[in-house]
Amino acid sequence: TAAGLVGGLAGMSLVKAFPALKGNFLIDEINSFIWESMGESYDNWQLITDYHFGGYTKWNQELIDFINEFYQKFRLKIDPIYTGKLFYGVWNEIKKGNFKDNSTIVVIHTGGLQGILGFNQRFGNLLNHNVET
């Protein structure tokens, strides 16, 4: 997703990617995808690796609390594997002042909602919303 956005923007806007995976190996992979698809490289992107919560499928109560509060406030369903980490990261980066004032921020919800029901079944309805609600 990040490589496609960076290549599609062709250096015109900044892309901040928030991976659910742990590790900086994605930097090389994204650069490789951009080069293979566009035939050039761009430096208009950043990989923000502080919000993986331990890696793929990892989570903690802080993330669950954020997801539930986010849903209560905005009525937007996010999951604890992918999009919850993304929105937590964006929200925290805004609070830390890491976006310029009056910036237009576009967050792409890349899916993962199908996991909410299974997550709640496995861990006891920690999320206050399901896919069908």
Say what each PLM segment does.
Residues T104-V106:
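Conserved beta-strand elements of the Class I
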Residues T1-F53, I108-T133:
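Glycine-rich phosphate/pyrophosphate-binding loop at beta-loop-alpha junctions
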Residues I48-N102:
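Active-site-adjacent helical/loop segments in soluble small-molecule enzymes
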